[in-house]
Amino acid sequence: MNPNLRKILEKQHYKIVGSHSGVKACHWLKEKLIHNRCCYKEKFYGIKSHRCLQLTPTINQCTQNCLYCWRYQDFTEQELESFDEPEFVLEKSIDAQRLLISGFKGDERCDKKMFEEACNPNQVAISLSGEPTIYPKLAEFIEVCHKKNMTTFVVSNGTQPEMIENLKPTQMYITVAAPNKEIYEKLCAPMIKNSWEKINESLDILSSLNTRTVVRHTLVDKWNIGLENSGEGSSPSRQISSKFVDEYAELDMKAEPDFIECKAYMFVGYSRQRMNLENMPSHEKIKGFAEKLSDLTGYEVAGEKKDSRVVVLAKDKRKMKI
């Protein structure tokens, strides 16, 4: 790993694992330990925020340079020339998580039982940074997690369909951050050829996977949800492009996911060098978008979490909890 990149990541409180992986304690893990406030994944799907291990097997490898990404992108690589074994990545990631949260043990606000549980995670969020499907042994890594009775969420940008069709996580996400190819190429800045076509192929594959599936729309105001000429002070629903919602609905129906997450871009990290605060949609606008998408897809609005600016739609909300 580039030593300058390592310094940047460590300053951001990442723990580097091996040669290409990383762990960072999630904001909501800390909130659960100190204030007993959970993330939207616990509220919607039932996983425990304080027992979630947030990691990436590709800390600096990606196929896109999305403008809204919080990642430092100057050292981005598109492949892994050599890679660590899945057992090593998981074991060292758990060790890293324990180090990251060790300071909470002496905090009188932290529940002791909850802290001990946090030191033994039972859920792995394979996202955080980079594109996880670049890791050639991702399928094996998921199997290693499951053998240890850990649930797995994989968040992918969908540009590697040949990998996605072989994955069996507990819950498989494809992020669709644009309604069409033109906006996708401007907003997501793909670094490989035919990326939009590959995402569409992944959406086709998603409908056939024998696991829980999610399409996530990361929504960026003035880019992939709002209209530049909507008018100052107009209502959130009037600031949403019906054409865009129609196009998103078409993509969603291709994938037939169990759930659709409509989530606001958050003005954090290095995205602040590429975006403005006004690009972060209000929760009201996200909710308006989700309601329009619900009307078009037939999916039910099944939950929302205002402080995360996210709304989830479900094909069958009785099946939301894992």
Give the location of each predicted region:
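Short Fe-S-cluster ligation motifs
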Residues: F88-A118
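Short, acidic Gly/Pro/Ser/Thr-rich loop/turn segments
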Residues: C62-N65, K181, F267, M320
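A broad, low-specificity signal marking well-ordered, structured residues that form hydrophobic/aromatic
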Residues: V23, L53, V124, T213, ...
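Flexible, acidic/Gly-rich N-terminal and inter-domain linker regions that tether
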Residues: M1-Y68, Y72-L99, A314
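Auxiliary Fe-S-binding modules of radical SAM enzymes
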Residues: M1-K43, S207-N210, W223-I322
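Short Gly/Ser/Thr- and Asp/Glu-enriched loop/turn motifs at secondary-structure junctions
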Residues: H50, C119-P121, K305-R309
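Conserved AdoMet/S-adenosylmethionine-binding subsite of the radical SAM
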Residues: R109-E232, P236-N276, P281-E284
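Hydrophobic, Leu/Ile/Phe/Ala-enriched alpha-helical segments that form helix-helix packing faces
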Residues: S93, Q97, I101, C145, ...
